[in-house]
């Protein structure tokens, strides 16, 4: 009787059943992790799309404000500038001032046109509190135009504005020499005739380094931004590679089980 009760049990049987239970739990865990990964990737794509939308909206707003301000200043400067009829301006100076003002206004109005056309559509989508509504925004399709408006308004537009300031200084200060020469006829002092020229030259000397610094800063900012995006893409690729290695290891474990 005791021999019947003390039946030897194969020690591998509970281990196999326990391993099978563990294998099923492990498969469920991998399946659940995969579903969570897919869900998180979906939300990550949605978050990236919303980030691009908000960035495009911010660029369009900044472009429209900057373009409206600088183009208005250029128009007022061209209208309000008073030319001395008795002074013989250099022909190249007048041509440069006219061309710079016209190009400045045209560039900023073009950027303002792009911002005015695209911004309402982006604003309408950004005010909808729905994750899937980001696909209705035209910011991805209009991305080249948004970048063009941003570049015209900030980079090219500001450089033209600096050139406009220099040309205005030359136009306003050059006639001072002839006015001083006419006023010095009643005095015994020798007329200098260099005040206007020196004033315009000083403004040019100051503005040239400012323009160079602006160009260097623009290039440095662009390179830094590109480097940051590249590093972020490398990090995302490394994270995806790690996830792939982990999933491959899990699949091998499941196959072994």
Curated annotation (Swiss-Prot):
Q: Which cysteines are joined by disulfide bonds?
A: none
Question: What is the protein's membrane topology class?
Answer: Multi-pass membrane protein
Which InterPro entries does the record match to this protein? CRAC_channel (IPR012446), Orai_sf (IPR038350)
The protein's superkingdom reads Eukaryota
GO terms of molecular function: store-operated calcium channel activity
Transmembrane parts of this sequence: 62-79, 94-114, 156-176, 201-221
Instruction: Tell where it localizes.
Output: Membrane
Kindly list the biological process annotations in GO that this record carries: store-operated calcium entry
**Cellular component, GO annotation:** membrane
Keywords, in A-Z order: Membrane, Transmembrane, Transmembrane helix
Q: To which protein family does this belong?
A: Belongs to the Orai family.
The protein's job, in short, is: Ca(2+) release-activated Ca(2+)-like (CRAC-like) channel subunit which mediates Ca(2+) influx and increase in Ca(2+)-selective current by synergy with the Ca(2+) sensor, stim1.
Recorded hits in PANTHER family, A to Z, give: CALCIUM RELEASE-ACTIVATED CALCIUM CHANNEL PROTEIN 1, PROTEIN ORAI-2
Q: What is this protein called?
A: Protein orai-2
Q: Provide the organism lineage as a comma list.
A: Eukaryota, Metazoa, Chordata, Craniata, Vertebrata
């Amino acid at each position: 009787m005791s021999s019947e009760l003390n039946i030897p049990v194969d020690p591998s049987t509970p281990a196999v059943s326990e391993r099978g239970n563990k294998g099923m739990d492990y498969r469920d865990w991998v399946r659940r992790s995969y579903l969570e990964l897919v869900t998180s990737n979906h939300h990550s794509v949605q978050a990236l799309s919303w980030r691009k939308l908000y960035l495009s909206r911010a660029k369009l707003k900044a472009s429209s404000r900057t373009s409206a301000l600088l183009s208005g200043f250029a128009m007022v400067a061209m209208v309000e500038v008073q030319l001395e009829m008795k002074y013989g301006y250099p022909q190249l100076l007048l041509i440069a001032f006219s061309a710079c003002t016209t190009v400045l206004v045209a560039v900023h109005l073009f950027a303002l046109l792009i911002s005015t056309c695209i911004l309402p559509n982006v604003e309408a989508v950004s005010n909808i509190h729905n994750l899937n509504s980001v696909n209705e925004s035209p910011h991805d399709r209009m991305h080249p135009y948004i970048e063009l408006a941003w570049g015209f308004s900030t980079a090219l537009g500001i450089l033209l504005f600096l050139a406009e300031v220099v040309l205005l200084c030359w136009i306003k200060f050059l006639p001072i020499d002839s006015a001083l020469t006419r006023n010095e006829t009643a005095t015994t002092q020798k007329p200098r005739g260099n005040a206007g020229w020196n004033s315009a030259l000083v403004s040019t000397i100051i503005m040239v380094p400012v323009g160079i610094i602006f160009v260097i800063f623009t290039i440095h900012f662009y390179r830094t931004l590109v480097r940051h995006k590249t590093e972020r893409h490398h990090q995302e690729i490394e994270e995806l590679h790690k996830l792939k290695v982990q999933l491959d290891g899990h699949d091998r474990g499941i196959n072994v089980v």
